Amino acid sequence: MVRYITTLERLGKDVTWLILQQARGIPEAKVIDDFMVDRTIVQMFAKADLSERLCITAAVRQMSGHCVYFAPEDKWEGAIERFPMQLLGAGSYYMDGMFVHGVPVRSWVPENEVTFPVINCGSPDAHPAHVIADIICMLNLSHDDLRNVQVAWVGSPSGALHSLVTATRYFPFRLSIAIPPI
């Protein structure tokens, strides 16, 4: 299984569909699972985002796991840029996975650098986890038939918008976009 979820493009249609199907099987938010007992996830946020942080923490706790949070003020981003192999290697001893937020995917791709899962949970150029959750909602509301689903994006461009555009290549929903002049 893919260990790095950075963009839908890198995952491709088949793997994106597989992850989506697996995510649909995740229990409701109030159900406690033991999938992550004695496992620790590190959240590395280059930009503060309380809603994303709480969402990830709740999901990991639901699966009986633990979270460690590195905030923007911890200055971790510069250290990883200068010493990626040393820090990520040492980190892999202490952690079982990593969520990265606020770092453009094109500037740091973890593939072949780490042995644990790395998930992009929101960057300026992609937000695959958010879009997979959106598509699950669309599937549930459309009774698994996305052909008649019309999605409207109204607002500023973001990683979620970029991932939605990519998702239209893999899934048969329509997307209308309205963004302010740049």
Question: What role is predicted for each listed range?
Answer:
Residues 1-54, 126:
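Positively charged, low-complexity intrinsically disordered leader regions
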Residues 8, 22-23, 44-47, 101-103, ...:
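Fold-independent oxyanion-binding glycine-rich loops
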Residues 11-16, 25-28, 111-126, 144-149:
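Short secondary-structure transition/capping segments
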